[in-house]
């Protein structure tokens, strides 16, 4: 079967339709993942109270920081895989998968072990409220055990998306979420034959869901003889190739640092929020849960844009990349804008799902949403622009932009302006950071040199015109033919 048919071809066809059809399963995966977190928050909040809810909010920020650290490695591998698939070079794509998978899993295990050992120091650094500290410790320690499986599942799904398949990741994300949701109340309350584990039961449910799902997706991919699977002689590709590993690390670390910058800003704001007590912290935690839904369209579109742009870079279809970005921005404005409007209209009924109707935290959370939620429309445009430029290997400018807009502007506004406008500074710091990031990202997209960059030396930059009869740059003339590859 031709290479393009055994993977997903994102280099032909109408761009808006192709982008939307690819993005919808990614959006579905994001919806399920966020729904999972929200439903778990409902179980924890209703069964165990506001202190437990604060504990999971603090612990989830730590988890996001860990996932962000290894996110860049997965993204670099995804872009390289997408470029190779676009160039119809599946042997190179398998080499990238092997090198990246080994390094990715090793780093995940290191983080899990270190996190387990230093969990108290991490929570104390966060300034976790005293009444939530024991609960956060119990929850986070089990989450650290789950980290390798969570990261491995994430890696497999991102690689499949780079190869043009967003439906398979959606199916197995659904499996993980269903298992997590089902086991949460059973293990929290000890229903039926299950032990009563309290907040640790919520984390254990996550561990079960992630482990079963990653095993299942690997079994299915090997049973289907997926072209990127490593079997037989190809298992030797799990031994890291130094040259490829250097590219993955050098390009992946800045992308991972982007997530760390966002996490660091979130942790800083959470630390300030915690100083106002458990009630404000719980309100902010619920608002942040809802913000994950608002950001889902932009994140899904960004993932689709990144894979689609990278495949077109690999195929030498430079004429399509700008239109991919424009379509992504348009979809973000429509979808994210619609979610913000819905949140403004139905915020209190939604907040009532997490907290009792007489909780003062509902009023606080509603105000937080009014002040900050609209800014995610702007940040969504930034996400799409970043996804486009990193398809050619431009990873440092987005990092610098995030450092300025999120770490300096957002956290600086929250910290220094609270002496002027009180806790309002925390909520309005989000629009301040989003406006800054959009202005800088748009400037780099328009005037920056990302079109002349490349990730692998023998692959020409996007600005180089094709000079062979194949319609691809000279460096691609020896690409793997479109023949069956097992």
Protein language model annotation of sequence segments:
Residues 1-23, 81-148, 194-253, 309-375, ...:
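Short alpha-helical transmembrane segments in multi-pass integral membrane proteins
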Residues 21-40, 142, 209-213, 217, ...:
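Transmembrane helical elements of multi-pass membrane transporters/channels
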Residues 26, 30, 42, 46, ...:
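Transmembrane alpha-helix boundary and packing residues in multipass membrane permease domains
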Residues 27, 31, 35, 39, ...:
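Generic alpha-helical transmembrane segments of integral inner-membrane proteins
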Residues 35-54, 123-130, 186-197, 256, ...:
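Helix-terminus/linker motif at the lipid-water interface of multi-pass membrane proteins
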Residues 44-64, 130-135, 199-200, 204, ...:
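Interfacial/gating helices of multi-pass transporter permease domains
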Residues 53-113, 150-169, 283-345, 379-401:
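Small-residue-rich hydrophobic transmembrane alpha-helices
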Residues 74, 143-161, 169-177, 202-217, ...:
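Short runs within selected transmembrane alpha-helices of multi-pass transporters and secretion channels
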């Amino acid at each position: 079967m031709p290479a393009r048919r055994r993977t997903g071809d994102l280099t032909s066809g109408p761009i808006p339709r192709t982008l939307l059809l690819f993005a919808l399963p990614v959006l579905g995966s994001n919806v399920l993942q966020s729904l999972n977190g929200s439903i778990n928050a409902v179980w924890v909040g209703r069964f165990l109270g506001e202190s437990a809810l604060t504990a999971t909010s603090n612990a989830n920020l730590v988890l996001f920081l860990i996932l962000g650290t290894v996110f860049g490695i997965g993204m670099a591998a995804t872009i390289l895989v997408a470029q190779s698939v676009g160039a119809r070079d599946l042997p190179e794509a398998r080499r990238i998968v092997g090198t990246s998978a080994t390094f990715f899993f090793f780093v995940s295990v290191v983080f899990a072990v270190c996190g387990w050992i230093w969990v108290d120091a991490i929570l104390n650094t966060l300034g976790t409220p005293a009444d939530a500290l024991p609960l956060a410790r119990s929850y986070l320690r089990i989450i650290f055990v789950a980290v390798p499986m969570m990261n491995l599942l994430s890696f497999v799904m991102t690689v499949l998306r780079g190869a043009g398949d967003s439906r398979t990741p959606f199916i197995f994300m659904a499996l993980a979420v269903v298992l997590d949701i089902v086991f949460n109340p059973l293990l929290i309350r000890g229903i039926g034959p299950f032990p009563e584990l309290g907040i640790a039961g919520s984390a254990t449910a996550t561990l079960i869901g992630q482990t079963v799902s990653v095993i299942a997706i690997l079994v299915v991919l090997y049973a289907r003889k997926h072209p990127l699977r490593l079997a037989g002689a190809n298992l030797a590709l799990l031994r890291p190739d130094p040259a490829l590993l250097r590219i993955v690390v050098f390009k992946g670390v800045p992308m991972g640092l982007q997530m760390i910058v966002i996490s660091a800003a979130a942790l800083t704001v959470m630390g300030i929020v915690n100083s106002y007590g458990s009630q404000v912290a719980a309100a902010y935690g619920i608002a942040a849960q809802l913000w994950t839904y608002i950001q889902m369209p932009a994140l899904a579109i960004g993932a689709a844009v990144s894979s689609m742009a990278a495949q077109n870079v690999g195929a030498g279809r430079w004429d399509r990349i700008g239109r991919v970005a424009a379509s992504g921005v348009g979809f973000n404005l429509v979808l994210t804008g619609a979610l913000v409007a819905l949140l403004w209209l139905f915020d209190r009924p939604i907040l009532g799902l997490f907290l009792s109707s007489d909780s003062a935290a509902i009023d606080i959370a509603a105000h937080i949403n009014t002040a900050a939620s609209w800014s995610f429309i702007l940040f969504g445009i930034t996400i799409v622009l970043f996804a486009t430029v990193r398809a050619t290997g431009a990873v440092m400018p987005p990092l610098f932009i995030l450092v300025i807009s999120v770490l300096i502007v957002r956290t600086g506004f929250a910290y220094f302006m609270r002496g002027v406008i009180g806790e309002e500074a925390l909520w309005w710091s989000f629009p301040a950071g989003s406006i800054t990031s959009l202005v800088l990202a748009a400037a780099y997209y328009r005037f920056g040199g990302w079109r002349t960059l490349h990730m692998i030396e023998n692959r020409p930059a996007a600005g180089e015109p094709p000079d062979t009869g194949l319609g691809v740059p000279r460096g691609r003339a020896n690409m793997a033919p479109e023949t069956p590859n097992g």
